[in-house]
Amino acid sequence: MVRGVANFVIVLVALAFGGGRAIDADEIEVVVSIKPVHSLVAGVMEGVGRPALLVTGTGSEHSYSLRPSQARLLDEADVVFWVGETMETFLIKSLQALASDAEVVELWKVPGLTLLATREGGMWEAHEHGDGLADAAHGEGEHVEEHEEEHAEEHEGEHAEEHEGEGEHADADHEAAEDHAHGETDMHVWLDPTNAKVLVEAIVSVVGNADPQNASTYQANAARLQEQLAELDRSMEDRLATVSDRPYVVFHDAYQYFEHRYGVNAVGAITINPTVRPSAQRLREIHERLEHLDAACVFAEPQFEPALVDTLIEGTSANKGVLDPLGADLDAGPDQYFRLMSNLAEALADCLGGAKSG
């Protein structure tokens, strides 16, 4: 019965993305937007080929600039995986201009994902709750929704313009970044290992259809990944159990799926748009609220001005930590996703369980 359900899901994924197309070349050319997704794709393709990664180093998925060599990768791609247009905002026009012949898979639309609604304005911005921000932080469970077919049609036909100059790219990226902050669905879907398992099913279906001669290898790799993801989920649940009630604040509201899965107590975010630096007035307001909420930790991100956190925690009892939803400092490859998620759990457990340093 379980095998039958799994096969049915694979068929649904294949139908959702047009059934794929078989590639004649010995090795398919697969391009992936960000490291966590690249890691899952690399795990499925291990022993057959190596997918190319676009956002490297500590680059932001919201404002990354493609190099000419990466533009060529898109032009030559058979398959492109990305999360979606309100996440990798830099890719919107490039995919239309350069990857029109590729099978482009927008992963947030994969059937079977648990999706969470974006928390409007971020927890700190919920003025209607006054100082009851901790209550706002625990409302995310109300927004769980199963993915349905209408999501696959929400963004069709919105971007018909051709690839043009850098100025127009900047405007498009800025507008899409605003959409990221205010869109209906939180796009950080990979930060729940149960969603990662669904993504693996989609990935193996797509690459198997594109490269049927290696489909059995992809399936074997995917089965191994599913076991590893289940073990990762269990170990993270155990690691976080003793600190799940301690309040903390993050740099931007990227971790809702992680919070929902493991029941940890995030009570605020410094910003809803990580590309825009908070004003001095806002930083003062947040500093006051940190004291009011008695937050145990404030977490920076390596991509976005970690020094801000030093300013915010000065004179409070909060510890400083670093969380990275992309694993930007980790080497790309099949192990990256597992190290990313383990690092998130370790960083939370260490900071929330520690005493004030300095």
Please place each PLM-identified region on the residue numbering.
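Bacterial N-terminal signal peptides
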Residues: 3, 7-18
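Extracytoplasmic metal-acquisition and chelation regions
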Residues: 17-358
